[in-house]
Amino acid sequence: GLKDWWNKHKDKIIAVAKEMGKAGLQAA
């Protein structure tokens, strides 16, 4: 289910989210 998918991918998702957050702050 969704929780299994999240547990499998969360590290990558979090890393990407952090990178996007940094880019957003720099662009602002």
UniProtKB/Swiss-Prot annotation:
GO biological process annotation, one example: defense response to bacterium
Subcellular location as annotated: Secreted
Modified sites of kind Alanine amide: A28
Entry's Gene Ontology molecular function annotations: toxin activity
Keyword Nucleotide-binding assigned: no
Keywords: Amidation, Antibiotic, Antimicrobial, Secreted, Toxin
Expressed in which tissues: Expressed by the venom gland.
Keyword hit for Magnesium: no
Main location per the UniProt record: secreted
Protein role: Shows a broad spectrum of activity against both Gram-positive and Gram-negative bacteria. Also has antimicrobial activity against S.cerevisiae. Has insecticidal and non-hemolytic activity.
Protein name: U1-poneritoxin-Da4a
Organism the protein comes from: Dinoponera australis (Giant neotropical hunting ant)
Lineage of the species this protein comes from: Eukaryota, Metazoa, Ecdysozoa, Arthropoda, Hexapoda
